[in-house]
Every structure is written in structure tokens, then in C-alpha cells.
């Protein structure tokens, strides 16, 4: 079938639309008509080369929601017309990690950077002029239609707005989970969030949900600091030095109980700054993505050992998508999670590049692509 998609032809590159050939749902797959897609910073990393993909061209987008139009062979529990939110990480429910409640580390995610079907690096669902096109994390939500593995799909109620739910499969789950699942926050704690874009703003929400008494949002962009207050931050500052000093004033000089690093392009320097901001036995959660080839992280081994500080990586906020996405939908419908307020601009498919320009200009918390009904 034919579909319009936003692709990156090579790196560094800029998103452009093209007519693509898309496979219909095969065994274990769903074909979905897209309703909305979030503009996640990770898709920009693939365009800039900060995160080089396995194949180019690649059709971007991994955070989205839509309506099932075709159900492949051997797929149980799904029907045409079902509403779906994609998890950018698959969950097979069978591997060691899924069995231990760590679906975000599912073994089927090992091939995500190939752009191919999950279990066959030579098999692609999209083509341009007869040549294979990679799917971003096997999903490609920057397309009018997409075909995905059922392990990337989570069914949601048909009466919940997909425009808002589209953000759950990456940005919201990642930020929220970084606070709720990994930061070890107790009621009354002091928490710093470094960078309050589409992920960090949800770490703010998660810290508030966990009972943090002081939530310090750090961002150089005034617009984002203002938005952070709307999402529950108690204090906002421009840089981590100010944030760390403020945390010490709240804790009799001890430092933050947890610092969550959600900077758009995270560097080892950001992690070192966060490490210096926490108290004894405090936690740094590293969620942001940067140059994955860098290995020059500088930390005090003495502080790590003697002060029992903890450095915690975060993939999708340690979320279990089959359980956590429905939970987040429920929180949203009960007014306990802000989603509508995250959306700062709406774009059409041919405006994806503009959306990322706006993101870099500090105009967006989360932009979304909205498709025709």
C-alpha cells in the first residue's frame, strides 16, 4: 500500500516527505492509520547523526497513536477499529527481562536500530523507489499508515483522545518513570530535574506524584521554566549551579535527594554536575541521550564509595509498557496526569522539519503531528 512519510535520506539531514510503499500486516503484525505522533528529540538525533541509524533513508517517528486497520495472521486480542498507542520498545512477555518485570529491556529490542523487522535484519516493511527504508525503532509514526510488530502495540480505550495519548509511548513514560520508578523519591524529598523539555517536564510530574516536597526545574529557556511551574515545579533556575545551591539551602547543606538528567543532548559534564548536586546516598538518574561514543565521564570514586551515591541509567524510565501505558491513561482520565497541556504546537506531516526547528528554538515542550481523520 502507498503512504506518505517523513524521511531522512542521509546524515546530517532534514526531514522531507516522500511517497513510500508499505507492507500490509503480516503474521504477528498490525497495520495502523495514524492519528497523531509526537516530535521526540530522539528522531532529531537520527537526523543530526548524534544517534546514527542502521539504514538510511529512515522514516522517522516512534511516539504515536492511531487506529488499527488490518490485523495480521496469528495476532490474538486485536480487531480492526481498536485504538493503539505504540511503545517504542517491544515487550514479548517471554524473555528473561519481561518475566522479571523489566519489559523496557526486552530482548526483542536488540534490533531496534536496524530499521527492519525485529527478528530479521534483512526484512523491511517500507520502500522508496524499490529500495528499503528503515522504520524508526520498527515503528515510523511520521507516516500516514504504518505496520508494526504487535509487541510494540498497547490497546487503549476508544473514548480517550489519541492526540494526547500519542505522547505516552516515549516522552511521558520516560520522564514519569525516571522519577517514579528510578529516582527513589520519598515524600518531602528535594528533587532536581535538569532540562524540562518533553521528557523533563514529565519527570517533574512524576516527582510531584511521588510526593517530593521541593522540585527544582533547571533550564536556560525562560518559556520552559514557566511551563515547569505549571506542571508542579516549586522552583525554577537557569543552571545546575543555582539548582544545586538551592537544594543545599533546603537540606541543611546536604544536597538534593535525587537529580534527574533529562537534557536534550546530554554530555558527561551534565552527569558530573548532577553527581555533585546530590547528598550522601542520593541518586542521579541519567535519562538524556547524547554522543554515545563518549567514554570520558569524570566522577569522584571517593564520593561514589564513601558517600554511597548512586548513578542510575534510565531506558524508558524502567516502564513496563503493557501495564504502565494503561495506568497512565487512567491517571490522565482522572485528572492526575497532564497530557493536553504538554502539546505546545500542532503540525502537519510536511512540517516535521519546522517542528524540530521550533524545538531547537525553545518554542516547544512537545510538538505533535496531527493526521487527517
Regions found by a protein language model. Give the residues of each.
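Glycine-rich phosphate-binding loop and adjacent beta-alpha segment
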Residues: 264-336, 371-373
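Short SAM/SAH-binding signature in class I
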Residues: 254-260
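C-terminal hydrophobic helical "lid"/dimerization subdomain
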Residues: 1, 241-242, 272-276, 318-373
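Glycine-rich beta-strand-centered segment in the early N-terminal region that forms part
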Residues: 23-37, 50-99, 104, 112, ...
Amino acid at each position: 500500500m502507498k503512504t506518505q512519510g517523513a524521511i531522512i535520506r542521509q546524515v546530517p539531514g532534514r526531514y522531507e516527505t516522500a511517497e513510500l510503499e508499505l507492507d500490509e500486516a503480516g503474521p504477528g503484525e498490525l497495520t495502523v492509520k495514524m492519528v497523531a505522533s509526537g516530535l521526540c528529540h530522539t528522531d532529531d538525533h537520527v537526523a543530526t547523526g548524534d544517534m546514527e541509524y542502521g539504514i538510511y533513508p529512515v522514516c522517522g517517528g516512534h511516539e504515536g497513536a492511531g487506529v488499527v486497520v488490518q490485523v495480521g495472521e496469528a495476532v490474538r486480542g486485536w480487531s480492526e477499529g481498536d485504538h493503539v498507542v505504540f511503545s517504542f520498545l517491544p515487550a514479548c512477555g517471554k524473555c528473561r527481562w519481561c518475566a522479571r518485570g523489566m519489559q523496557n529491556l526486552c530482548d526483542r529490542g536488540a534490533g531496534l536500530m536496524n530499521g527492519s523487522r525485529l527478528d530479521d535484519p534483512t526484512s523491511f516493511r517500507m520502500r522508496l523507489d524499490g529500495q528499503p527504508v528503515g522504520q524508526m525503532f520498527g515503528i515510523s509514526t511520521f507516516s500516514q499508515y504504518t505496520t508494526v510488530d504487535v509487541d510494540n502495540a498497547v490497546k487503549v480505550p476508544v473514548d480517550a483522545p489519541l492526540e494526547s495519548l500519542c505522547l505516552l509511548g516515549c516522552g511521558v513514560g520516560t520522564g514519569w518513570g525516571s522519577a517514579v520508578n528510578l529516582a527513589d523519591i520519598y515524600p518531602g524529598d528535594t528533587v532536581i530535574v535538569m532540562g524540562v523539555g518533553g521528557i523533563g517536564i514529565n519527570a517533574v510530574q512524576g516527582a510531584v506524584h511521588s510526593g517530593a516536597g521541593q522540585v527544582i526545574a533547571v533550564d536556560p529557556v525562560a518559556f520552559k521554566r514557566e511551563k515547569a511551574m505549571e506542571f508542579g515545579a516549586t522552583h525554577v533556575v537557569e543552571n545546575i549551579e543555582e539548582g544545586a545551591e538551592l537544594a543545599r539551602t533546603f537540606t541543611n547543606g546536604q544536597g538534593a535527594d535525587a537529580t534527574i538528567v533529562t537534557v536534550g543532548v546530554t554530555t558527561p559534564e551534565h552527569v558530573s554536575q548532577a553527581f555533585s548536586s546530590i547528598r550522601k546516598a542520593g541518586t542521579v538518574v541519567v535519562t538524556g541521550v547524547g554522543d554515545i561514543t563518549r567514554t570520558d565521564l569524570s566522577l569522584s570514586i571517593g564520593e561514589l564509595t564513601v558517600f554511597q551515591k548512586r548513578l542510575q541509567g534510565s531506558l524508558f524510565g524502567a516502564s513496563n509498557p503493557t501495564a504502565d501505558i494503561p495506568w497512565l491513561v487512567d491517571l490522565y482520565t482522572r485528572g492526575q496526569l497532564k497530557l493536553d497541556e504538554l502539546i505546545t504546537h500542532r503540525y502537519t506531516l510536511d512540517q516535521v522539519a519546522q517542528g524540530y526547528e521550533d524545538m531547537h528554538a525553545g518554542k516547544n515542550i512537545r510538538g505533535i503531528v496531527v493526521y487527517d481523520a
